[in-house]
């Protein structure tokens, strides 16, 4: 095994370590995607494409993989440099533009899995999912719940997030209802999350969902595990099934 990954030994078989090295992953969105990208790289995924046209802002620093000196610089550029500082030999492709209907086709889609960490301030995340489905690429949807991580995986064929009940004006609240319903169906105490949704509902029209670094750290591990399972052809649950991890009762 490559000396860089020798401490992965036993946890990851040598043949799987080699498999994930060349497994191409697309990360759409370098906010939540910033720590996911680093976690994947440190595991051994060395073929990553990161796409985002946003710049680092002060309000990102409570949770995203950036520092004060990065403010004003494009996230994709900063993240590429950080990833190359970790592994200079990694193949990090950058698309430092906001993804839209006109440029999505410009991204080289020789990928095996996509991570949709785009902001739901428009319909672009849905366009992203539809485009990946046409290319037969499964899509991982991660959600930072503050004190928890939640994700679901969309298969190329089957239900997608547009099938969610549209009970609220903002998509984030509709996803929140889906998450709360999913937790209750598994007999998981969702009271803390329901209380959060009630408070967030008061500001949802003017603010994106509040998030914590803790939730993103949890989520990065969850997403990386799912991508590893996809890469090594291990079992994965697909939407509407989901994954949740938290220490909240």
Regions found by a protein language model. Name each.
Residues 1-11, 229-249:
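Phosphate-binding loop/pocket of nucleotide- and phosphate-handling active sites
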Residues 156, 219-237:
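Oxidoreductase and adenylate-handling cofactor-binding alpha/beta cores
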Residues 1-26, 58:
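N-terminal charged helix/coil linker that caps or initiates catalytic domains
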Residues 47-87:
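Glycine-rich phosphate-binding loop and adjoining beta1-alpha1-beta2 segment
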Residues 32-33:
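Hydrophobic/small residue at the entry helix of a nucleotide-binding pocket
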Residues 25-29, 50:
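Hydrophobic Val/Ile/Leu positions in short beta-strands of Rossmann-like dinucleotide-binding domains
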Residues 102-110:
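Short amphipathic alpha-helix with an adjacent loop that forms part of the alpha/beta core around
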């Amino acid at each position: 095994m490559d000396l860089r990954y020798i401490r992965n030994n036993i946890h990851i078989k040598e043949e799987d370590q080699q498999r994930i090295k060349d497994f191409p992953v697309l990360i759409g969105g370098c906010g939540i995607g910033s720590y996911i990208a680093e976690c994947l790289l440190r595991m051994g995924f060395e073929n990553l494409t990161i796409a985002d046209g946003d710049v680092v802002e002060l309000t990102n620093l409570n949770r995203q993989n950036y520092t004060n000196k990065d403010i004003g610089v494009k996230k994709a550029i900063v993240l590429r440099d950080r990833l190359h500082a970790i592994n200079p030999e990694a193949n990090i492709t950058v698309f430092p533009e906001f993804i839209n209907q006109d440029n999505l086709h410009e991204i080289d889609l020789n990928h095996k899995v996509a991570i949709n960490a785009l902001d739901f301030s428009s319909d672009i995340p849905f366009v992203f999912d539809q485009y990946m489905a046409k290319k037969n690429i499964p899509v991982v949807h991660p959600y930072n719940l503050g004190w928890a991580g939640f994700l679901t995986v969309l298969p190329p064929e089957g239900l997608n997030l547009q099938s969610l009940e549209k009970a609220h004006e903002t998509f984030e609240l509709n996803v929140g209802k889906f998450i709360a319903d999913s937790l209750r169906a598994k007999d998981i105490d969702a009271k803390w999350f329901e209380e959060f949704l009630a408070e967030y509902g008061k500001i949802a029209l003017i603010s994106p969902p509040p998030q914590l670094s803790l939730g993103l750290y949890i989520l990065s591990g969850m997403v990386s595990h799912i991508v590893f399972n996809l890469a090594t052809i291990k079992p994965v649950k697909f939407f509407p099934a989901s994954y949740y991890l938290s220490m909240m009762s």
